Amino acid sequence: MSTHLRKLPGLLLCLLLALPAWYLGRLFPIIGAPVFAILLGMLLALFYGHRDKTKEGISFTSKCILQTAVVLLGFGLNLTQVMAVGMQSLPIIISTIATALLVAYGLQKWLRLDVNTATLVGVGSSICGGSAIAATAPVIKAKDDEVAKAISVIFLFNMLAALLFPSLGQLLGLSNEGFAIFAGTAVNDTSSVTATATAWDAIHHSNTLDGATIVKLTRTLAILPITLGLSLYRAKKEHDIVTEENFSLRKSFPRFILFFLLASLITTLMTSFGVSAEVFHSLKTLSKFFIVMAMAAIGLNTNLVKLIKTGGQAILLGAICWVAITLVSLAMQLSLGIW
């Protein structure tokens, strides 16, 4: 049997799990399809015994399909629009990202948490939830159970943010503009940002959704420097351990991240010539679906019992990152005169 045919059973299994997860994600956007995909994968893994037939396809989906999803994610980024609208929030975005990464790095040893999980929780909390985890996982060579743990943590605090932030914003007296920036900088995943801003708009009859989404997309750009930095750091560290040859910068660059940048540049260039952003809508949707497929594969490779037993430290780290980002976002708004 050829290599491609050997991958087919596992690929089809991930596809079959992704379809109901996608549907459930549309019904319950506060949770999101990737979380449903991981849950379905982990539940099936408890009873599924034909691993030899599907192993190659599951591995292909969790790696290659995931990287393809990140590349396609670039077609949702118009760099001109993001920078024009998101510049006001840039100091807040930089501050919240730096805060979460420093918290994750600083507390990793104290919590006795593995480096990869701490890194994924840090980037997921600070940049763009599941998409940032999807982009970072191949770069740091994270295991599937580490990815599942980080995604689960991000989901928990996404849900809490969507439920609590509209009331918190009202209690603090945030303006519509202030809440858009708050939701865009302090909520992790795009679907949760949408849910949070929509809840605010329903209460105040406003339109914060567009502003919050643009701020969120501006955060997404941080995928590039963060993943490239992590890639170079890891490659240099591994290089120093195994060899004394000169370090190659070109070989260390993750190609799929460069293709992500190229996709963003193509989108920006074509829209500047009058091409409608709707042209790229199907590619953006395909990117999201590929992420759901990859999360199903990761769920299939994750031991649910072990995840429950070892997830406490990751949840605590996620909670601290979440609170820190929330406080820094509000403090920066106060210092900049937005709030």
Curated annotation (Swiss-Prot):
Main location, first listed in the record: membrane
Keyword annotations: Cell membrane, Membrane, Transmembrane, Transmembrane helix
Listed Pfam families: Cons_hypoth698
Location in or out of the cell: Cell membrane
Top-rank taxon: Bacteria
Coiled coil: none
UniProt keyword Hydrolase present: no
Stretches that traverse the bilayer: 7-24, 28-50, 57-79, 84-106, 118-140, 150-172, 256-275, 290-307, 314-336
GO CC, alphabetical: plasma membrane
Membrane topology of the entry: Multi-pass membrane protein
Family affiliation: Belongs to the UPF0324 family.
Identification of the protein by name: UPF0324 membrane protein spyM18_1033
